[in-house]
Amino acid sequence: ADEIARLCRLPGLEAEGLFTHFADADGSEAYTMAQFDRFLAARAALEERGIAFKICHCASSAAVLQYPCTYLDMVRPGLVLYGWYPAEELKGLDGPGLEPVMAVKSRVAAVRSLPKGTPVSYGRTAVLERDSRIAVVPVGYGDGYPRSLSNRMVMRVRGVECPIVGRVCMDMCMLDVTDVPGVQAGDVAVVYDGPLLERAARLAGTIPYELMCAVSKRVPRVYRLNGVSVDKNLQPL
């Protein structure tokens, strides 16, 4: 506390806030409360030395859902802003419940009819077992879509789940749309929604939040209020 107080008194420096971050707020209540108590003790020690902070905060999404006593001056919801729970055990703690609000969509760029035996994408990891219609979707690992989902994941076109065929490329991937009548260039391909994101995270051995954060800057963001884009120049697919 003495060292922090000394730093706060440096000329030209105004210490405005004090914060910590819970290590296991979606797990152990005892550990989280012990961490919170240590934080409060540190704040009190600084106040005894004449250092007061305008804003003190520590409540992450898991704490927001469970521990109102940790709210202090503000809270830091992250994952819950996307409509996701930090842990399965926390579902139902917020009354009506959260619903995923983020989706990633693209459009089919081209559709090709290919004969049985045709290899698809880099490395020829997929060889068509029947005459097929293959759709090209301009989404790849350059957009944050995991290459590890090659030959494993699906996207949704015209309401039907279509498997990824071959390796995910930097800027595109290929879907088998043989069983979806009428697919054509311009059709919307749902890359992620709630169920698809959860499935993709499970296959990739990670959590949905990592995949959401991985969506690269080159992917346009469309923010909607009551179903309407807040930017008239960007419209949702």
Predicted segments — roles?
Residues 1-107, 111-115, 181, 232:
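Active-site loop/helix belt of alpha/beta enzymes
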